[in-house]
Regions:
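Bacterial N-terminal signal peptides
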Residues: 13-25
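Bacterial N-terminal signal peptides that target proteins for export
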Residues: 2-15
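Surface-exposed extracytoplasmic segments
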Residues: 27-230
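Intrinsic structural disorder
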Residues: 1-2, 23
């Protein structure tokens, strides 16, 4: 793929900002879906991450997760959807003159496809420091000294869905203020409703110099998905 076809409206957009000069890790999350988005799991974004690469300095990791199942629904999780008609885009806005203009300076595109044997693979386009790369899913592959991965992983998103439900329900009860047993409270045991749940992930390293364009170390990123029109 050297060019991407036109695609329909973006059903999901998540945004965060990060300073590459610090050991900052940030994420944005969206796990509660409308029926329309929930009906298209391959295009349903969950989180976007950016953090320093643990493999060494000079590299930053970007990640998009999608196709998760919101707790407390069925705990039967499937494999990564290999949908060639979905385009995943990681948008990068570089800081200029101390501010952001909310327009992407760099766009990393990702798309799945199958070879003649029916095996699923991922292609990434316009990766800072690597350009276009491709490889099989569920395998870490390398190009230009950077690492890439697409497949299923334990969902890193942490959320106490049971506590949230108890908190919301308490406000509907006469005389309750939300401070009830089982609700969100500081100092109380935490429950991770997404623990041991599969999430589909696209993960890629970027060269810091190419990521920032040699300018400010601060960037703002967001992710979108879109279906190819046809």
């Amino acid at each position: 793929m050297t060019a991407f076809p036109a695609f329909r409206g973006m059903p999901r957009r998540l945004a965060i900002a990060a300073a590459l000069a610090t050991s900052l890790s940030v994420m944005s999350a969206d796990h509660a879906e409308s029926p329309g988005a929930d009906a298209d799991p391959a295009a349903d974004l969950a989180d976007v991450f950016i953090f320093p690469s643990p493999q060494g300095s000079g590299r930053t990791v970007g990640a998009i997760t999608f196709a998760g199942r919101s707790a407390p629904r069925s705990r039967i999780d499937g494999d990564i959807p290999c949908d060639r008609n979905v385009i995943y885009t990681f948008h990068i806005d570089r800081e200029t003159g101390g501010s952001f203009d909310n327009v992407a300076d760099v766009q990393v595109h990702a798309r799945f496809g199958r070879n003649g044997r029916g095996e699923c693979g991922l292609q990434l386009e316009n990766v800072p420091g690597a350009g276009t790369v491709s490889g099989p899913i569920e395998t870490v592959f390398e190009a230009s000294g950077l690492k890439f991965f697409a497949g299923t992983r334990n969902d890193p998103f942490f959320f106490d869905a049971e506590g949230y439900a108890a908190l919301v329900a308490s406000f509907a009860a006469p005389g309750q203020s939300g401070d009830v047993a089982g609700a969100f409270r500081l100092g109380q045991p935490r429950r991770d409703s997404f623990a041991a749940r599969n999430i589909s992930a696209i993960v890629f390293e970027m060269d810091n110099g190419a990521l920032t364009g040699g300018g400010s170390s601060r960037v703002r990123v967001w992710a979108t998905t879109g279906r190819i029109a046809g």
